[in-house]
């Protein structure tokens, strides 16, 4: 039995993001939640984090099918002088979601406790699949909420993951 059904709400957030991104204009993608973090950078950061954790830390395949073939490399949000288009962001979000879907479909509840290590700032850290999935769900939800609030604050349609998906 896979863990995919447990994460149905995460899928809803992804669907809303995929529905909303293509409708954003270049000017709307430049709206900032905080100085230096326009919507396009937030969406890019969200997508890149999936590759970092799943492909980089957990060694899952698929990074090469995304705009982030080096999971530990520079992300688009690290280059604020190169704004990304709605089309590029949609590709990033959809291609990284395919990695998420693959993991959720293959991983079982028994696999969630498996421990992986990463080195950060010279220190070894231990992470379970469960802890990283929780981190990624919360990370996506936080940044989708950030984008949604920012759009709403500017009088633009926001994203509600709990509206019925048709």
At which residue positions do the language-model features occur?
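N-terminal leader segment of winged-helix/HTH proteins
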Residues: 1-4
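Short leucine-rich amphipathic alpha-helices used at interfaces
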Residues: 6-8, 57, 83, 89-90
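An acidic intrinsically disordered interaction segment
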Residues: 7-15, 106-112
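Hydrophobic alpha-helical core bundles mediating ligand binding, dimerization, or RNAP-core interactions
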Residues: 10, 14, 21, 93, ...
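Acidic/histidine-rich alpha-helical segments that form the ligand environment
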Residues: 76-117, 130-139
């Amino acid at each position: 039995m896979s863990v995919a059904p447990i994460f149905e709400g995460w899928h809803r957030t992804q669907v809303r993001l995929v529905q909303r991104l293509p409708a954003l204009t270049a000017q709307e993608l430049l709206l900032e939640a905080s100085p230096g973090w326009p919507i396009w950078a937030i969406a890019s950061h969200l997508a890149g984090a999936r590759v970092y954790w799943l492909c980089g830390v957990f060694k899952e395949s698929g990074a090469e099918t995304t705009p982030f073939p080096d999971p530990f490399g520079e992300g688009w949000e690290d280059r604020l002088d190169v704004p990304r288009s709605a089309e590029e962001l949609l590709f990033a979000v959809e291609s990284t979601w395919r990695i998420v879907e693959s993991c959720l479909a293959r991983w079982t509840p028994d696999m969630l406790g498996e421990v992986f290590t990463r080195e950060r700032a010279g220190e070894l850290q231990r992470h379970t699949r469960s802890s990283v999935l929780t981190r990624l769900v919360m990370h996506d939800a936080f940044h989708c909420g950030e984008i949604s609030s920012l759009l709403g604050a500017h009088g633009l349609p926001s994203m509600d993951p709990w509206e019925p998906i048709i």
